[in-house]
Design a protein with these regions (language model features):
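Glycine-rich beta->alpha junctions and the first turn(s) of the following alpha-helix
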Residues: 69, 80-162
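Non-catalytic surface loops within mature trypsin-like serine protease
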Residues: 8, 26, 57-59, 73-76, ...
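A short, Trp-centered hydrophobic/proline-enriched beta-strand micro-motif
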Residues: 1-7, 54
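A short core secondary-structure module
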Residues: 31-32, 36-81
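Glycine-rich phosphate/pyrophosphate-binding beta-alpha loops
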Residues: 11-13, 40-46, 89-90, 128-133
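A structural signal for short hydrophobic beta-strand segments in well-ordered beta-sheet cores
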Residues: 20-24
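A generic structural signal for well-ordered coil/turn residues at beta-strand boundaries
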Residues: 14-18, 29, 47-49, 66, ...
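Intrinsically disordered, low-complexity coil segments
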Residues: 25-32, 112-117
Length: 162
């Protein structure tokens, strides 16, 4: 199972405000990135085999252009998970924090092979997800309205229908 790691404690889902960094390095084992930072409310993180991670590869670029997307093996050394979040709804989608502490990610795992395209990648995913959540909310609201109307049509108070 894959998990989408965008949201951060101080940035929410604002990809342009991400603080998680992925700094390129080269050593005897080749090119890689060193990832440091925290992600919050990451859906399916406890079950994930891989993360699609959004991280800042260009710390000088504070905007969306400095964000890149990576595929990261969830079993990589340096990845730790927070306690499972307790939620009122969507309990089937388990969420928790994910912490990246000097996690080594092969350069080949940069999605698209070019730095700075992570914001566009994130938006492609989020646009569909946001439409889905909106549709779920409309469906739930309609059901509640139908149930309330049915109850109001049957309910009596002081011998009269309300």
């Amino acid at each position: 199972m894959a998990s989408f790691a965008l949201t951060e404690p101080d940035a929410g889902s604002d990809a342009a405000s991400l603080r998680t960094t992925a700094i390129k390095a080269v050593d005897s084992e080749g090119e890689h990135y060193i990832v440091n930072g925290s992600k919050r409310y990451i859906t399916n993180a406890p079950q994930a085999g891989v993360f699609t991670l959004m991280a800042r590869t260009n710390p000088a670029d504070k905007g969306a252009g400095g964000v890149s997307a990576f595929i990261v093996d969830a079993k990589s050394p340096g990845i730790s998970l927070g306690k499972p979040d307790k939620k009122m709804g969507q309990r089937g989608a388990h969420t928790c924090d994910v912490v990246f502490d000097n996690v080594r990610v092969p350069a080949a795992n940069l999605i698209g092979g070019v730095e700075g395209r992570g914001f566009k990648t994130a938006m492609k995913v989020l646009e569909k997800g946001r439409i889905h959540i909106a549709a779920v909310c409309v469906g739930v609201a309609r059901r509640m309205l139908d149930d309330a109307l049915k109850y109001a049509m049957e309910r009596q108070q002081f011998g009269q229908k309300i």
